[in-house]
Amino acid sequence: MTLRRSILAFTGGMILVLALICSTFMCHMMMGTLSDLEEAYVHQKVDGTLFYLQEDLSSLKRAAEDWGHWNDTRDFVIGENDQYIQDNLNSWTLSGLDVDFMIYYDRSGNLFYSRAFNHATGEEVPAPGRLLSLAKDDPLIAHSSPEDGLTGIVSDPEGLLLVSSTTILDSHWKGPISGTFIVGRRLDGARAEGLARLSGIDLRMAATAPVGESEGTNSKTSLLIVKEDSDTLIATKTIDDVYGNPTVLLEAQVPREIRSRGLETIRRQVVGIFLASLLFGGLILLFLELSILMPLATITSSVEAIREQEKGQGSRIPTVGPAELATLAESINEMLDHLESYNQKLAMSEKRFRTIVDTAHDCIFIKDPKSRYVLVNPVMERIFQLPASKMLGERDEVFFSAETAARIREKDAGVLSGEPFVGEVSAHTRAGSSMTFHAVKVPLRDDRGQVTGICGIARDITDIKEAGVELLKRDRLLSASAAASYSLLVNYDIDQIIIDVLQLLGEAVEADRAYIFENQTVDGEVLMSQRYEWTKGEVEPQINNPVLQSLPYHPDSSTFYEIISRGRPYVGLVKDLPESERAYLAPQGIVSILIVPIFVEDRLWGFIGFDDCHRERFWSNGEISVLQVAAGSIGGAFIRSRTRADLVRAKGELQERIGEVEAKNAEMERFVYTVSHDLRSPLVTIQGFVGFLREDLSALDGDKIKIDLAMIEEAVLKMDHLLKDTLSLSRVGRVVNPPEEGSFGEIVHEALSQASGELRSRGIKVSLAEGWPRVRVDRLRVQEALTNLLDNSIKYMGDRPHPEIEVGWRPEGEETVFFVRDNGIGMDPDQWEKVFGLFYKIDPDSEGSGVGLAIVRRIIEVHGGRIWIESEEGRGTCVLFTLPTP
């Protein structure tokens, strides 16, 4: 677009925008005023409707007072005017008063008489039921003074009612109050239409809630105005009924006449303002075109014609327009004269220089003082894979990374100050490749000796440098592999040495992450899990990533598994891998990956992997070969570690078995001693009383014979209890039921059912926890343990006035702790461990054999749990234990 067109377009656009802004502002301001007028109009209409409604109620109140304060009405209510109904309560009377019903209540608040007519049909109809069953304290009939009265709206199931109630007095408006006179009109559709005609709007009135629901409320709402459509507004307002409750809804449809007329006026004014603005803008544009833009266009077209000529010799610009533009044309003509002479000299020099530049095998370039390329040769085009047209005028930031460009600018600054540069330059291109150049840069000077640019020659020595770097990397990798192999041979701590080996190898190959995965087979499916990992400080570790545990090879990594199972490395860029593999590699930030399989005894044990999370890297064959050797060393280390672990485990199991045998022998000795001692006591008792029995039989002493037999029977029963408890203890751990998974709460309820009789007889309150966890146990044994604990709590409850037992659970770390707590007699801390001993009793004279807690402990320990006591003498006992959960 030419300058002329740009100026015209810009100026015209600004004028148009200003016209639109003025029109919009005017429209917005007037629309706000129009909305206020429309709202005021709606308020006026609704207020008019309410005024007419109030006038209707006022006329009704006057009728009520005229009839209520009348001797005939008073005599009728007190039963002294039998002609009142015939003379006064007929259809033409009600029609003349414009009322639909009259209702009379006596001074006791009881309904005395009611009459209602349908004026359209002239027939008598029932009075509104809502007014025939008023409570005696209803404000309509409950009066505290002769002046009392209520006028308003009442909600009836059949519709709204206009009602006025007043006291019944004599014709002089004096008491006493003889009753209540209620007169009213139905606020039906016809009456609502009459109000609508008076106010000039469509009107609807209805109850907001069923009769009686709104009594007691005090809320009031203001007028709510909403738009139904573009032509109608809906105004709603809640009106208080005769009781002061907002139960009457008034809804009015108001035509938007003001809005229609106002919008038309606004449209006309906006169009007028817009057209006036356009006319003014057109005059401004015409002035610019004639005085400035047309002369400027003539000069511009002449310059363009000269530029398009092959050499532009002999062509000049006409001097037209104002003085400033004519002077500009003359200056341009002088410049053209100098330019023709300079071009001739430059053409010959350019031809010579171009021959040298185009045939050189090194990069040749020239930069201006701002380090912009003004000349590049074909070698630079080939290296950067860009045509010269894309390179000229650009700085080094376009071709190199920001860091490289900054270093080049620093060297260029020295050259521009007059100091030549000779040396190597390491560069990173924007495409991500690394290059090394041997560069020579010298300053370019003009005829006055001023530096006008930089001329440089650069030779690409990247291949030479990379070859040297690769040799150094291979030496470092071989050294790391040798050190890793040595460490794997001489160290036994396989877990720590593997981490050290991963660090050695990872640093040697300049990886960001090195790791080892181990395979395992579950239900015939081969899974892989990460076991070891080393990472650089800035790279996020993945050793705790649950996604990398028990990860199946199939189907997402089938190709990967097929490659490494053949002993081949898996290498590549993550972006080029299948989508199924990228799904879990990309979230780890991996860019390039190398996987080397680890075989143990000719079986794919797992693999060692190396990640580069910062660059797209292509692993060399030399690196892969060395890492394959290292993977073999790691596999051998795992074989040796497993062999050592098997030996240590076998030795440990042997020592454990020896310890178990020794412990069982010691336990057996204690058991035999205790059983022989406790069983001998009943036998001695039996033997002694058998002697007494012989003597008593000889003496034929019947009473003593009974005593002797009772003591012998008691000793036999004691021996039977001891034998049963001993047998039960011996079965724990030997007679085992299959473990079952279920709620621990079910086991608790089963144990409580066995002890329920004793609990009820002792009046013991039992509290149970909620949300019981699931356990996998021998249900019968655990139920037996709980029953013993409940029996102990009952037995040692003492004489507590409010005995209680609590059975519950709580999580503690990775364990689930169950407990049975009572508020019994408790025990000293020095008894906490003793009570689990065989046949041990705190009170030797108490019931039982002292085997119960020993059985409980044995049951818990057989399940792999532990049991302990928390107690204080006089403050109850809590037995706690753990059990395995699924």
UniProtKB/Swiss-Prot annotation:
Post-translational modification remark: Autophosphorylated.
Enzyme class per UniProt: transferase
All residue ranges annotated as the Histidine kinase domain in the record: 674-886
UniProt domain PAS: residue ranges: 349-419
Domain HAMP, residue spans: 290-344
Alphabetized UniProt keyword annotations: Cell membrane, Kinase, Membrane, Phosphoprotein, Transferase, Transmembrane, Transmembrane helix
InterPro entries per the UniProt record, alphabetical: CHASE4 (IPR007892), GAF (IPR003018), GAF-like_dom_sf (IPR029016), HAMP_dom (IPR003660), HATPase_C_sf (IPR036890), His_kinase_dom (IPR005467), HisK_dim/P_dom (IPR003661), HisK_dim/P_sf (IPR036097)
GO molecular function: phosphorelay response regulator activity; phosphorelay sensor kinase activity; protein kinase activator activity
Disulphide linkage map: none
Organism domain of life: Archaea
Localisation per UniProt entry: Cell membrane
A Gene Ontology term for the protein's cellular component: plasma membrane
Stated induction or repression of this protein's expression: Transcriptionally regulated by FilR1. Transcript level increases with cell density.
Keyword Nucleotide-binding annotated: no
Enzyme Commission number(s) from the entry: 2.7.13.3
Protein task: Member of the two-component regulatory system FilI/FilRs, which is involved in the regulation of methanogenesis. Autophosphorylates and specifically transfers the phosphoryl group to both FilR1 and FilR2.
Protein name as it appears in the record: Methanogenesis regulatory histidine kinase FilI
Origin species: Methanothrix harundinacea (strain 6Ac) (Methanosaeta harundinacea)
UniProt gene name: filI
